[in-house]
Amino acid sequence: MRKHSDCMNFCAVDATKGICRLSKQMINLDDAACPEIKVMPKCKNCKNFVEANDEGIGKCVGLEKEDWVYSTLNAITCEGHVFNE
């Protein structure tokens, strides 16, 4: 399930809620995303994110040096991010 926090239109206000840039409404970041979702680049949706454990910690193999990362890490500026098919 994709969440509001997985959308480029989500603007965080604090640790639990934010504003939808489309509807201008306050929303909870963990609620299900709407059909208008514009998927934000994150490690969890990158083909270079591998070997994730049950806690969402995996390995990035898309950069010069492999390293452990959280699946929820924003990857907007990551040069190695490639969306999964």
Swiss-Prot record:
Binds 2 [4Fe-4S] clusters per subunit. The keyword Hydrolase does not apply. InterPro entries: 4HPAD_g_N, HPA_decarboxylase_ss_sf, HpdC_C. Its EC number is 4.1.1.83. The keyword Iron-sulfur applies. Has a half-life of 15 minutes at 30 degrees Celsius. Keywords: 4Fe-4S, Iron, Iron-sulfur, Lyase, Metal-binding. It catalyses: 4-hydroxyphenylacetate + H(+) = 4-methylphenol + CO2; 3,4-dihydroxyphenylacetate + H(+) = 4-methylcatechol + CO2; 2-hydroxy-2-(4-hydroxyphenyl)acetate + H(+) = 4-hydroxybenzyl alcohol + CO2. Pfam families: 4HPAD_g_N, HPIP_like. It is an enzyme of class 4 (lyase). NCBIfam families: glycyl_HPDL_Sma. Component of the HPA decarboxylase that decarboxylates phenylacetates with a hydroxyl group in the p-position. Active toward 4-hydroxyphenylacetate, 3,4-dihydroxyphenylacetate and to a lesser extent p-hydroxymandelate (2-hydroxy-2-(4-hydroxyphenyl)acetate), forming 4-methylphenol, 4-methylcatechol and 4-hydroxybenzylalcohol, respectively. Is likely involved in the catabolism of aromatic amino acids such as tyrosine fermentation. Heterooctamer consisting of 4 large (HpdB) subunits and 4 small (HpdC) subunits. This is 4-hydroxyphenylacetate decarboxylase small subunit. It comes from Clostridioides difficile. The lineage of its organism: Bacteria, Bacillati, Bacillota, Clostridia, Peptostreptococcales.
